[in-house]
């Protein structure tokens, strides 16, 4: 019983804290990936450069910094324009979905993750991301309803107070 109560409070805490199962990336990792891209550009093969760019894209869309996430989205969208093997496109679509999720564009993120699932129905990462997106949309909806209800309640109280004050004056 105590375990169930603990789970309940953990889920409530997670609901209000906004935590999810998608990893974060810090500036040091991004700087390291940028250095790898420079080195691969200077002295590596084209395949090594592509691999380093994918790692950098991953790091950028997993960043806590909005400008990094936007940069990662732009890099991935530009790289999708060139023809690539389906597996590589699937990875890029997934990373784009993460980037759009991180930037708050949940509908675009869900569209992209759905495309990933169409490509591979049992892809666990994509399925977890889809659930995370849906949970976030639900949570935002519940919070929005709460804010709206609170606003209507406040307006009702003010209107009731005015009516009560006017009826006392008569």
Curated annotation (Swiss-Prot):
Report further notes.
Overexpression of FIS1A increases the fission of peroxisomes and mitochondria.
Recorded hits in SUPFAM superfamilies, A to Z, give: TPR-like
Residues spanning the membrane = 142-162
Asked if the record carries the keyword Cell inner membrane, the reply is no
Keywords assigned = Membrane, Mitochondrion, Mitochondrion outer membrane, Peroxisome, Peroxisome biogenesis, TPR repeat, Transmembrane, Transmembrane helix
Which organism is this entry from? Arabidopsis thaliana (Mouse-ear cress)
Q: How does it sit in the membrane?
A: Single-pass membrane protein
Matching InterPro entries: Fis1, Fis1_cytosol, Fis1_TPR_C, Fis1_TPR_N, TPR-like_helical_dom_sf
The record's statement on gene disruption is: Reduced plant growth. Increase in the size of mitochondria and decrease in the number of mitochondria per cell.
> Where is this protein localized, as stated in its record?
Mitochondrion outer membrane; Peroxisome membrane
Q: Which family does it belong to?
A: Belongs to the FIS1 family.
Judging by the UniProt lineage, the source's domain of life is: Eukaryota
Any idea what job this protein has? Component of the peroxisomal and mitochondrial division machineries. Plays a role in promoting the fission of mitochondria and peroxisomes.
The TPR repeats are found at 90-123
Identify this protein by name: Mitochondrial fission 1 protein A
* Gene3D superfamilies on file: Tetratricopeptide repeat domain
This protein's GO cellular component annotations are: chloroplast; cytosol; mitochondrial outer membrane; mitochondrion; peroxisomal membrane; peroxisome
Keyword Cell membrane found: no
Domain topic, free-text comment? The C-terminus is necessary for mitochondrial or peroxisomal targeting, while the N-terminus is necessary for mitochondrial or peroxisomal fission.
Task: Give me any GO biological process, just one.
Answer: mitochondrial fission
**Record's subunit section:** Interacts with ARC5.
